[in-house]
């Protein structure tokens, strides 16, 4: 049996059962990912996709896959990241066809970081994708032994209230596994290091406020009876299960967006893929605001050509997301200039020209 998504991906072995306890087949997985693509893609587009594959179903062995295989289709976008162990080329899933390819690979889980690739100009005037700043925060609420869903939700509400106090908004998900995930969109991107520091401070503050229920410490022996508020997934080298991704559990559950009202329900549980499809058809994407703030196109002005000729990795110059309004078209600018020796430039900008 075969199927086609966007005339590019052919589904094979559609009747193969990947979730034996539920009878869910590879064809069902393919159908889910193609139908959920419209709401899932905004949360993973532009980010390196790590896949966790179960080629023989969830009762058999699985493996993580980062490096894009040489057999991957040419039309699939890709970009490379340099790690301590070497350089890895990742697929970028930004289309229905990309998600269909994920399903055909029996990659039930998709994991992404909190940053997106950004385009930079090289000395040869070629555009190259490089890891960019974080566009959102994520908190993984991991229950220790004996922790109930109600206690997880109590901690989630406390995180939400603390984040609200600093002027940001938080959106909850049931992870499809054991815990809850909380996403906070950033009004302006920040470095992954900065995002990690902020998330850690939030976790430590909650630990002080709720010491019998919350821990920000990774030591597993200290987690019994507590919620581990995992802030570390904001690190640029780490990933989190993507919103709307399936999970490789006994049942075909999903990392599913929820409402805060639902988190007050004592019967709150994880959702299956068919339930998530029905919810999206009814309510749309509950996370639509999470990845909508940082999708603006770069500002074009009289310096666009000049900046395109610079090597931003050597001498970066900050470019505002919106042109500042000035009464007479004149602006004084102080720029931190990373040349051979760090120095600061004091410049006059008149009508968009420095």
Question: Model-found features: residue ranges?
Answer:
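Short beta-strand
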Residues: 52-54, 170-176, 217-221, 335-336
